[in-house]
Amino acid sequence: MKKKLLSLLFLVATLALTGCGYKKPEVHSMLGMNIKSITTVCGTDCSMDTIDTSSTSDHGMITYYYTDVAGDKGISDAKTYYNYLKSEKHCIKIDDFDEKKGNYSAYFQLNEKQVKSGFLMKVSFTKNSYTVYIEDNI
């Protein structure tokens, strides 16, 4: 009995630490991107471990935030990333916003052949920071 209780406790602790086996997705593979593309947009210090994950609805929607404060370099990287997404055949730009010097946002959605509906990406940047938001139904 004691052994079963310890086994159960170990299982619960393992699930708590691993998020019930759910791993943060490798975004570059979801978009058909190579790792260099993600490294570029995140800056040198960004890794999958530094992405904040938060629930945004009761339906299992998860939002991933990639944020970096990098001044002009950050703007350059964000524009590169935006242009990359715009050029990808399986990324559809579904909305964009006021384009100003140093301030731009756009929403991208993968076409239905690549992923189920509900996947949305937003790229935004200002003079001091840039953020990539990714929402994914799990």
Show which residues each predicted segment covers.
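Positively charged n-region of N-terminal signal peptides that target proteins for export
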Residues: 1-5
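Sec-dependent N-terminal signal peptides
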Residues: 6-12
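C-terminal motif of bacterial Sec signal peptides marking the signal peptidase cleavage site
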Residues: 16-19
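An acidic-aromatic pocket/loop used at catalytic or ligand-binding sites
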Residues: 21-138
